[in-house]
């Protein structure tokens, strides 16, 4: 009888334990669902003009509704935000203050419609950032591959109404949640899987950009000048920023991996991203990538390996660039279509060979690095040799480009010229007029501004020419011009706190684990967006900005996680 009671008590205990576990599993599933849905919508947007369509809301409004609906449900769900770090709440509060000021600007705005649009856009970014920041469940690579691939395919071949696209992406998120979500994994592993998933749409952006040059008759370039690659985003400068962010993520991620196959694939992605970045001819994007690369080398560990990875990719990359110099129609708007098609086919053949070489070099290097280890003296000598070689290569490349620019370094980039002349031009073009008009408007209304999203009307009233423009091409000045001092300070505080917090955490981490390098890659990618936004209007292409906020939230979570215990780190590395 006593045995029966004991068995009954044990059964009852298991039942109570299962009941206690069920809410945890449901919460983990909902968190994974939320993150997958946000990422799926972002990937779809990166494939469809960045969710931007001039004057039409249907491209990004459904995504905004989904993100805000998920945020509303998350707020009502107990325990959803319990793992958000203190620093994360500070960042959320600063973004919320920015959204609040933009909403209040409805009282004094000169255009209610534009203010509503901008407030809704900013609220969507806040929602995506908060949701990503709260998610502490892991989705392995297979789950990310499922969701990202389906989103890319739907964007490429969609013929059904937009709402069905979102429903199908939600289905993908549900599948990924039920099949792959895990909670009891280290933060580094969760973030690594997220980075792997986000590199897939970057590969799609790079691939489509290359197709625009390989098959120009089938994949037309939609940019204004008809020869700068805009890829699926349609705007070359924003495409360059996404590619630069992806290249830094690929470089940092491949350095943390040991699998030769994965490292070879990342080498192909890195080469493709850098080549497409060059074909955008975006000075701001390329220089922002350079700044981010410097941040990565300053904060990251394994610098010698990163230099080796870059050198291995630069071997086929330099050969490919040399071959492209004889394909003049690639970067010429006036070239006949027949010449463009012929040069595109030549580029295709060279590109296939370069990708094979990049994959093979990285795979062989990864195999050798896993079997042999250099001594400290050899590392030091190789580091010095690599640094000197990189400096010489940079100096020679700079001299070649400047020599080919014809001395037009300070010319207006809008005046045309060759690709080399455009890349070395320091002029800011019409942006000087945009900034002057915006600054004068801010001085007239320093506390309130003219209303969120209303710069186009300020420009129409004060423009010195007949040229039309909607954005001020400076995200920071735009906050002050449109919504006054308080919005400017809120956004500036968000940027400074985000970069300082994550960079400090990366610098203080142990160099022996993969967490420092992974966090440094995220910080570098975030810096690329923030630096480029000083001369561009990426904020108004929701998909690119959602991509940024997902990375920013991942960096904040990883920064707060800190180093794992030494024994756990050793076990994870050994496994």
Where are these regions (language model features)?
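Transmembrane signal-anchor hairpin modules in multi-pass inner-membrane enzymes, especially those
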Residues: 1-104, 110-117, 127-199, 253-267, ...
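Membrane helix-loop boundary segments at the extracytoplasmic
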Residues: 43-53, 480-483, 517-549
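Membrane-interface alpha helices of multi-pass inner-membrane proteins
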Residues: 150-155, 268-281, 528-534
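Aromatic-rich transmembrane-lumenal/periplasmic boundary elements in polytopic membrane proteins
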Residues: 208-219, 395-444, 448
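Membrane-interface segments at transmembrane-helix junctions in multi-pass inner-membrane proteins
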Residues: 218-249, 253, 332-354, 475-479
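TM-adjacent membrane-interface loops and short helices in multi-pass inner/ER membrane proteins
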Residues: 235, 417-470, 476-479, 483-490
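Transmembrane-embedded, aromatic-rich helix segments that form part
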Residues: 241-242, 285-295, 488-493
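Hydrophobic transmembrane alpha-helices and their immediate junctions
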Residues: 265, 485-520
């Amino acid at each position: 009888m006593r045995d029966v009671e004991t068995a009954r008590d044990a059964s009852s205990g298991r039942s109570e334990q299962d009941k206690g576990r069920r809410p945890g599993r449901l919460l983990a599933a909902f968190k994974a669902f939320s993150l997958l849905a946000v990422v799926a919508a972002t990937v779809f947007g990166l494939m469809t003009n960045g969710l931007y369509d001039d004057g039409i809301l249907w491209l990004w409004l459904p995504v905004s509704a989904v993100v805000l609906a998920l945020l509303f449900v998350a707020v009502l769900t107990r325990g959803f935000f319990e793992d958000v770090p203190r620093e994360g709440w500070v960042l959320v509060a600063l973004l919320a203050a920015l959204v609040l000021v933009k909403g209040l600007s409805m009282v004094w705005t000169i255009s209610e419609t534009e203010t509503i649009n901008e407030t809704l856009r900013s609220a969507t970014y806040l929602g995506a950032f908060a949701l990503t920041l709260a998610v502490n469940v892991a989705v392995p690579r297979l789950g990310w591959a499922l969701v990202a691939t389906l989103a890319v395919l739907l964007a490429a071949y969609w013929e059904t109404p937009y709402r069905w696209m979102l429903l199908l992406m939600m289905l993908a998120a549900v599948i990924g949640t039920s099949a792959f979500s895990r909670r009891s994994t280290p933060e580094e592993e969760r973030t690594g899987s997220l980075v792997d998933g986000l590199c897939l749409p970057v590969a799609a952006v790079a691939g489509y950009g290359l197709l625009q040059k390989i098959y120009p008759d089938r994949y037309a370039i939609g940019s204004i000048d008809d020869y700068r690659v805009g890829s699926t985003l349609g705007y070359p400068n924003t495409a360059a920023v996404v590619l630069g962010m992806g290249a830094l993520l690929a470089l940092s991620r491949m350095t943390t991996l040991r699998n030769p196959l994965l490292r070879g694939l990342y080498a192909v992605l890195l080469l493709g991203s850098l080549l497409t970045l060059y074909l955008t001819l975006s000075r701001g994007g390329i220089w922002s990538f350079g700044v981010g690369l410097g941040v990565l080398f300053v904060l990251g560990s394994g610098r010698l390996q990163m230099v080796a990875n870059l050198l291995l990719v630069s071997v086929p990359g330099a050969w490919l660039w040399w071959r492209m110099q004889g394909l003049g129609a690639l970067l010429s708007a006036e070239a006949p279509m027949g010449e463009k098609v012929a040069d595109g086919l030549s580029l295709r053949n060279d590109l296939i060979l370069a990708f094979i070489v990049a994959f093979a070099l990285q795979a062989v290097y990864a195999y050798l690095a896993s079997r042999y280890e250099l001594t400290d003296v050899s590392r030091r000598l190789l580091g010095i040799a690599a640094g000197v070689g990189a400096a010489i290569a940079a100096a020679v490349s700079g001299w070649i480009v400047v020599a080919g620019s014809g001395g037009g370094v300070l010319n207006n980039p809008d005046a045309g010229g060759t690709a080399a002349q455009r890349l070395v031009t320091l002029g800011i073009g019409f942006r000087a007029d945009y900034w002057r008009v915006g600054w004068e408007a801010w001085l007239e209304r320093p506390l309130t501004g003219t209303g969120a999203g209303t710069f186009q009307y300020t420009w129409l009233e004060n423009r010195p020419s007949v040229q039309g423009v909607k954005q001020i091409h400076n995200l920071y000045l735009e906050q002050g011009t449109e919504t006054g001092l308080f919005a400017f300070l809120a956004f500036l505080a968000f940027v400074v706190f985000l970069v300082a917090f994550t960079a400090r955490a990366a610098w203080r981490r142990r160099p022996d684990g993969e967490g420092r390098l992974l966090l440094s890659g995220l910080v570098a990618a975030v810096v690329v967006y923030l630096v480029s936004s000083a001369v561009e209007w990426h904020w108004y292409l929701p998909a690119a900005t959602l991509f940024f906020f997902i990375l920013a939230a991942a960096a904040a979570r990883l920064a707060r996680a800190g180093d794992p215990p030494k024994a756990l780190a050793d076990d994870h590395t050994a496994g």
